[in-house]
């Protein structure tokens, strides 16, 4: 057989970039380079008129029962914490079944994924494929949040609340088994993975045990309910007994103790610290110190991401609304102002870039924008590239691969590890739920091309349904067939505790969604478990100036004047 040489640009136009090719992410300065291509050159598969995936060519006679894939995403550029590679991705029974080379093994060499008559194709040529995002800080204020999050590329959400109650406006806590049952029953209506956090503020175990058995997959300690050392100690003790995670929003006013007292109450036990910078709440001015502890899994909420010229101005009004404060009361105003510090917000940028802050989340409608978790993660990465240059791991490589792996881990695999669901979601890996998002590189992180949930397309931009083709304007993000009927419950799960499942929660509530027990959330995970984000510097905060130092180095940076992934993408 004769080989034919073609230009890289021509090859990329036909099959997408290959090993050594570089791709810019949206309009950022972040450049990725393809590390490996799983294809066999000359044997690539592609769907369409006159293309490869036809009967007797790239499509075999193998049935699905015999091993053919249900769906193949062809020639996609996978961007994940473990690598940046070009491959075909197979989906079977709603799970990722293989990453490799698709085709017809009867006539093609190197085939690891079989295409048969029962195989559908999603064209990934020239596209980027990522795992669906996981937002682990949700105030369940309104159900419309879920669609907005899904359309941004988030396929899993964890948080608390009961709807637009004042307790939910301020805290991510679902109080008590009755409210928990109603929330979990409502989850059958949504095509995403969902989990409920119960209220963790109690000084005795019984109320917390009741909530865990009632369906909580985590417990949330929030200062508005009283995050005292006694409540912290009790909550962590119960969590250890039932293998669920604890999230904490610490005591901004330092009423029941200072950050040192809270750390002492941890007793070295694993805990997920929300908005660790402090603008979202927590010991003023030095809660950020916990980001350097080995047992703390720290995350940010996105209003402070990244630090810009507008960040400080917008926060005060947000805070007054979210925490039911009155600007005419001096004490309420002082409470709000104590949380907004430009010095710690600037340091937050750098701690993310150093891998000391491990996760990104939203704090939806309660000082956070749930549709912008992914955008603001990459805006932070871009700002740090512009201000700090290449990371040491990327020096001399003419790409930003390590930085990209570090940042994508913040909203995919790391929250999945922290909350005990990384065996099911969080990355593009064989054996995991096929929760996948396809992006055009120019719109990466901003507007997805297609969102796959449990192997089924659940959302995509769609043109006029009455048009002769799918693309005429107006183009809107719309729910697809996977978001309706029993398909939405078959392709997603509810995260809960093993105790709830053992106690027959699904039967008691009459729900259709499968329950998935969180696991390995306690002593066997620590900051070292946070992939690419496990740094534990010694962090100090000057109580007078609020300056932040990590291992003695001052952490400061200028606010951004202009951001990528912003107005040019949302003009209409």
Swiss-Prot record:
Residues 132-572 form the Urease domain. Ni(2+) 2 binds at residues 220, 249, 275. GO terms for molecular function: nickel cation binding; urease activity. Ni(2+) 1 binds at residues 137, 139, 220, 363. Carboxylation allows a single lysine to coordinate two nickel ions. CDD domains: Urease_alpha. GO terms for biological process: urea catabolic process. Its EC number is 3.5.1.5. The modification N6-carboxylysine is found at residue 220. GO terms for cellular component: cytoplasm. Its main location: cytoplasm. It is an enzyme of class 3 (hydrolase). It comes from the Bacteria. The active site is at 323 (proton donor). Pathway: Nitrogen metabolism; urea degradation; CO(2) and NH(3) from urea (urease route): step 1/1. InterPro entries: Amidohydro-rel, Metal-dep_hydrolase_composite, Metal_Hydrolase, Urease_alpha_N_dom, Urease_alpha_subunit, Urease_AS, Urease_asu, Urease_asu_c. Keywords: Cytoplasm, Hydrolase, Metal-binding, Nickel. The keyword Phosphoprotein does not apply. Its cofactor is Ni cation. Heterotrimer of UreA (gamma), UreB (beta) and UreC (alpha) subunits. Three heterotrimers associate to form the active enzyme. This is Urease subunit alpha. It comes from Bradyrhizobium diazoefficiens (strain JCM 10833 / BCRC 13528 / IAM 13628 / NBRC 14792 / USDA 110).
């Amino acid at each position: 057989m004769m080989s034919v040489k073609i230009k890289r640009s021509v090859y990329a136009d036909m099959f997408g970039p290959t090993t050594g090719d570089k791709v810019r992410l949206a309009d950022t300065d972040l450049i990725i380079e393809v590390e490996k291509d799983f294809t066999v050159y000359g044997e690539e598969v592609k769907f369409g008129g006159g293309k490869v995936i036809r009967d007797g060519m790239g499509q075999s006679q193998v049935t699905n029962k015999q091993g053919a894939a249900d769906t193949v995403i062809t020639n996609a550029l996978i961007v994940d914490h473990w690598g940046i590679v070009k491959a075909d991705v197979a989906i079977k029974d709603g799970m990722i079944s293989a990453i490799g080379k698709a085709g017809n093994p009867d006539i093609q060499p190197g085939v690891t994924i079989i295409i048969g008559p029962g195989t559908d194709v999603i064209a990934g040529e020239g596209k980027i494929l990522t795992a669906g995002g996981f937002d682990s800080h949700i105030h369940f204020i309104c159900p419309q949040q879920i669609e907005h999050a899904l359309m941004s590329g988030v396929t899993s959400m964890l948080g608390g609340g009961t709807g637009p109650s004042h307790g939910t406006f301020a805290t991510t806590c679902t109080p008590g088994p009755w409210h928990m049952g109603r929330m979990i029953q409502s989850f059958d209506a949504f095509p995403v993975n969902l989990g409920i956090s119960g209220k963790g503020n109690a000084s005795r175990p019984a109320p917390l045990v009741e909530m865990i058995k009632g369906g909580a997959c985590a417990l949330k300690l929030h200062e508005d309910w009283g995050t005292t050392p006694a409540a912290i100690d009790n909550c962590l003790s119960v969590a250890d007994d039932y293998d669920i995670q604890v999230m904490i929003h610490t005591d901004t006013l330092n009423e029941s103790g200072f950050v040192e007292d809270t750390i002492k109450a941890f007793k070295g036990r694993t805990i997920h610290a929300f908005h660790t910078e402090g603008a979202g709440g927590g010991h003023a001015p030095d809660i950020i110190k916990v980001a350097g502890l080995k047992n703390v899994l720290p995350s940010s909420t996105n209003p402070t991401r990244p630090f810009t010229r507008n960040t400080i101005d917008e926060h005060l009004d947000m805070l007054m609304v979210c925490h039911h404060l009155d600007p005419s009361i001096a004490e309420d105003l002082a409470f709000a102002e104590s949380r907004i510090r430009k010095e710690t917000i600037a340091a937050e940028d750098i701690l993310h870039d150093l891998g000391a802050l491990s996760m990104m989340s939203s704090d939806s409608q309660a000082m956070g924008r749930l549709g912008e978790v992914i955008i603001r993660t990459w805006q932070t990465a871009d700002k740090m590239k512009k201000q700090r240059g290449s990371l040491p791991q990327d020096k001399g490589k003419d790409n930003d691969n390590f930085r990209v792996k570090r940042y994508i881990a913040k909203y995919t695999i790391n929250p999945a590890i922290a909350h005990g669901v990384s065996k099911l979601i969080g990355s593009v890996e064989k054996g995991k739920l096929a929760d996948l998002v396809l992006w055009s590189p120019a719109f990466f992180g901003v507007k997805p091309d297609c969102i796959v949930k449990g192997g089924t397309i659940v959302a995509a931009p769609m043109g006029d349904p009455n048009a002769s083709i799918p693309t005429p304007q107006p183009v809107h993000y719309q729910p697809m067939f996977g978001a309706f009927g029993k398909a939405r419950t078959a392709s997603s799960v509810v995260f809960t505790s093993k105790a709830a499942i053992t106690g027959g929660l699904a039967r008691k509530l009459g729900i259709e969604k499968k329950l998935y027990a969180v696991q390995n959330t306690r002593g066997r995970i620590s900051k070292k478990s946070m992939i690419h984000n496990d740094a534990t510097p010694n962090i100090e905060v000057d109580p007078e100036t609020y300056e932040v130092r990590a291992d003695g180095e001052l952490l400061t940076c200028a606010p951004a004047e202009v951001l990528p992934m912003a107005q040019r993408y949302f003009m209409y």
